[in-house]
Design a protein with these regions (language model features):
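Serine hydrolase/lipase
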Residues: 96-99, 143-154, 171-297
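Surface-exposed flexible segments
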Residues: 19, 114-117, 121, 226-237
């Protein structure tokens, strides 16, 4: 899960260039503005879930940057950022000499531009059975990494829309790379349209290792997961579990509200009624869209 959070930090190619082409996560966090921005969010957040979420984000950042953290030792080798144009952002992390992680950023709602790029063009694009620009970006980035690097083992991951992109990256990876993708994890990412599943069925069948899909909110219940994915409902923390107001239903999707067993493993949960209902609704919408498209052909 840590890699998905690192993908939300605003690291740049310029920062890497200043350090000879790569830098540890700890170096960039300590030299950048992430701490100040997260501290500001805590100070400005209203009491309640927003304050809790902001505090947990800051706590995780401090933990990653800590002197004894193995996550802080990870090297950032590359940043792919077309966030302003398409909403796409991903980082390549080296965890040791033989392993690398490609982490994809998820949906953001910090300003109108990001709402348009992520929630409308990308997330709603999935619901309406449209190919998304960000999915193409993810596939292109996998091809670029495959050309530039030769790690024996890769993992792909992301939260929310980033989880959908991570699954797509595993599905659309170059043939000589897919066998080296030993792990793919989607954290509450939405699924895919029926048209996507049909169009990519041969590639889906060739995914070398099962994709793990953790879900705990209505976002992760949307649309259809491919046959290469194993979906698992996990538990959220007590401070939001029984809260049914509108804000809680939206914020539940955040990774700070995942329940951890000893800080290492997730806990099995049960699907809430809203997620169940929205999942069924999204399938009906997808079926209607496919039917109307075929009528026009």
């Amino acid at each position: 899960m840590v890699a998905t959070q690192i993908a939300y930090y605003d690291f740049t190619k310029e920062q890497l260039a200043e350090r000879g082409g790569s830098a540890t996560v700890r170096e960039l966090l300590n030299d950048g503005t992430e701490f100040r921005e997260l501290e500001s969010k805590v100070n400005l957040a209203e009491e309640g879930l927003k304050r809790i979420m902001a505090a947990k984000d800051l706590e995780l950042c401090e933990s990653i940057a800590g002197s004894g953290s193995r996550y802080g030792d990870w090297k950032i080798l590359d940043v792919k950022n077309t966030n302003e144009e398409t909403g796409f952002y991903a980082v390549l992390l080296e965890t040791d000499s033989g392993h690398a992680i490609i982490a994809f950023r998820g949906s953001e709602s910090k300003d109108y531009n990001q709402v348009l790029k992520d929630w409308i063009n990308a997330d709603f694009g999935l619901l309406m059975a449209r190919d998304t620009v960000q999915q193409k970006n993810a596939a292109d980035y996998m091809a670029e990494i495959n050309q530039k690097y030769s790690y024996p083992y890769y993992a792909v991951t992301g939260h929310s829309l980033g989880g959908n992109l991570a699954e797509h990256a595993a599905i659309a990876a170059p043939d000589d790379m897919r066998g080296r993708i030993y792990q793919a994890v989607s954290f509450d990412g939405p699924g895919y349209s029926g048209e996507y599943i049909e169009r990519n069925k041969d590639l889906i069948a060739r995914v070398a290792h099962p994709v793990v899909h953790y879900r705990w909110s209505l976002i992760g219940a949307l649309l259809t997961q491919p046959t290469c994915a194993v979906s698992r409902v996990i538990q959220v923390t007590e401070d939001i579990r029984s809260n049914t107001d509108k804000e809680a239903l939206y914020m539940r999707h955040g990774t700070p509200f995942i329940e951890w067993n000893g800080g290492e493993s997730v806990v099995d949960g049960t699907e809430d009624l809203l997620a169940f209902a929205m999942g069924k609704w999204s399938l009906k919408v997808d079926e209607t869209v496919m039917k109307k498209r075929r009528e026009k052909e």
